[in-house]
Curated annotation (Swiss-Prot):
Record family assignment: Belongs to the class-I pyridoxal-phosphate-dependent aminotransferase family.
Catalytic reactions on record: L-aspartate + 2-oxoglutarate = oxaloacetate + L-glutamate
GO BP field: 2-oxoglutarate metabolic process; aspartate metabolic process; biosynthetic process; glutamate metabolic process; leaf senescence
PANTHER family, A to Z: ASPARTATE AMINOTRANSFERASE, ASPARTATE AMINOTRANSFERASE 3, CHLOROPLASTIC
Functional description taken from the UniProt entry: Amino acid aminotransferase important for the metabolism of amino acids and Krebs-cycle related organic acids. No activity with D-Asp or D-Ala as amino donors. In plants, it is involved in nitrogen metabolism and in aspects of carbon and energy metabolism.
The organelle targeting sequence, given as a residue range: 1-43
Protein name (Swiss-Prot/TrEMBL): Aspartate aminotransferase 3, chloroplastic
Name of the gene this protein is made from: ASP3
Tissues/organs with expression: Expressed in roots, cauline leaves, flowers, hypocotyl epidermis and root hair cells.
NCBIfam families: PRK09257.1
Positions of disulphide bridges: none
Organism: Arabidopsis thaliana (Mouse-ear cress)
Protein origin, superkingdom: Eukaryota
TM annotation in the entry: none
Length: 449
């Protein structure tokens, strides 16, 4: 092999020369052997990642993976948390199409990076939507809002902020809760504990257990609260119960962290679904709110969300925002522009906003209709048990009370897919598919699986 000689005019040249002499010190075959023995080379050696095991599918998203592999013409996917039309098709809201067309027609729009905090107009409008335009926190500039990557991203940013800057590192989440919650907060650096919420015996709220567990929590602990349409149970506290929860939490200095993934999607009213949050803000205390526009605007794939932190003063809110930027910058630098722009167009335009509320109400009403139809279908079949929880629960999901063995039976024999805890997405049902689901539930219950 030919040797290349460098002059010693610089330390850089000397280092390069030393490296080449090292490479040339052995035979060509030795060098090639050394090269191919390197674990990161393109040779025939094993991968440095060969020790990895195959990770299981996500328990929720994996339902759709299994569904897609099933060739059955009668298969039914009730696992995914996404709205479907009566024909079982994904829905893009008309108001979203109109907003997008406005954006397309605006030739002045550019695709530059957003600030770290996101689209400022979107942030202001999101705060007004969740807290109310007349909120004292907004009026007094005691709130900071940053655009995040849908609900998951909002929770993660909030979790990391609390892990870095809040004196308590423990967060209490409901038992049960959305499967991603414990992972989000654990990886954010918080210690996750649970508080009682659902009563399997009544298929309703275990309110006494909830109060006891929050009452026993260490002062200052963080408490994750589902603002409405609890996932996965569909069981929400009454306004009177929310008031008791608020008083208890404020008396112990517990920090409320609201997950608002379904505003307007639960009752059909944006204001009704935001009432628990507004109760906490009205007392002058501090709290965090994670918002998502995946469900209520159907912007699942646009990943549009916001994190709002209500503070005691405008000065503190400004400092909080400065620290949120330091959390976001190394995580994803700045959020996407398109989805937030769609939301901003709809929220700022009175006509589009009104049209959105009508479409939102129509989606909520269809889900309520599916609940009634399923309940009536089970009653008509004489299915053993009390199924009234189906019409008492609220929002996208119903916690059926079916166990994993029963779920497995329904998947195998009836090609119905849902999470193993028996949660079904009512938004995935239609008038045509309700009888098939009712037949499957009736069969699995009467067979005592």
């Amino acid at each position: 092999m030919k040797t290349t000689h460098f002059s010693s005019s610089s330390s850089s040249d000397r280092r390069i020369g030393a490296l080449l002499r090292h490479l040339n010190s052995g035979s060509d075959s030795d060098n090639l052997s050394s090269l191919y023995a390197s674990p990161t080379s393109g040779g025939t050696g094993g991968s440095v990642f060969s020790h990895l095991v195959q990770a299981p599918e996500d328990p929720i998203l994996g339902v759709t993976v299994a569904y897609n592999k099933d060739p059955s013409p009668v298969k039914l996917n009730l696992g995914v948390g996404a709205y479907r039309t009566e024909e079982g098709k994904p829905l893009v809201l008309n108001v979203v199409r109109k907003a997008e067309q406005q954006l397309i027609n605006d030739r002045t729009r550019i695709k530059e990076y957003l600030p770290i905090v996101g689209l400022v107009e979107f942030n202001k409008l999101s705060a007004k939507l969740i807290l109310g335009a007349d909120s004292p926190a907004i009026r007094e500039n005691r709130i900071t809002t940053v655009e995040c990557l849908s609900g998951t991203g909002s929770l993660r940013v909030g979790g990391e902020f609390l892990a870095k800057h809040y004196h308590q590192k423990t967060i209490y989440i409901t038992q049960p809760t959305w499967g991603n919650h414990p992972k989000i907060f654990t990886l954010a650096g918080l210690t996750v504990k649970t508080y009682r919420y659902y009563d399997p015996a009544t298929r309703g709220l275990n309110f006494q257990g909830l109060l006891e567990d929050l009452g026993a929590a260490a002062p200052g602990s963080i408490v994750l609260l589902h603002a409405c349409a609890h996932n996965p149970t569909g069981v929400d506290p009454t306004i009177q119960q929310w008031e008791q929860i608020r008083k208890l939490m404020r008396s112990k200095g517990l920090m409320p962290f609201f997950d608002s993934a379904y505003q307007g999607f639960a009752s059909g009213s944006l204001d009704t679904d935001a009432k628990p949050i507004r109760m906490f803000v009205a007392d002058g205390g501090e709290c965090l709110v994670a918002q998502s526009y995946a469900k209520n605007m159907g912007l699942y794939g646009e990943r549009v969300g916001a994190l709002s932190i209500v503070c005691k003063s405008a000065d503190v809110a400004g400092r909080v925002e400065s620290q949120l930027k330091l959390v976001i910058r190394p995580m994803y630098s700045s959020p996407p522009i398109h989805g937030a722009s769609i939301v901003a167009v709809i929220l700022r335009d009175k006509n589009l906003f009104n049209e959105w509320t009508l479409e939102l109400k129509a989606m909520a009403d269809r889900i309520i209709s599916m609940r009634k139809q399923l309940f009536e279908a089970l009653r008509t079949r004489g299915t053993p048990g009390d199924w009234s929880h189906i019409i008492k629960q609220i929002g996208m999901f119903t916690f059926t009370g079916l166990n994993p063995a029963q779920v497995s039976f329904m998947t195998k024999e009836y090609h119905i897919y849902m999470t193993s805890d028996g949660r079904i997405s009512m938004a995935g049902l239609s008038s045509k598919t309700v009888p098939h689901l009712a037949d499957a539930i009736h069969a699995v219950v009467t067979k005592a699986v």
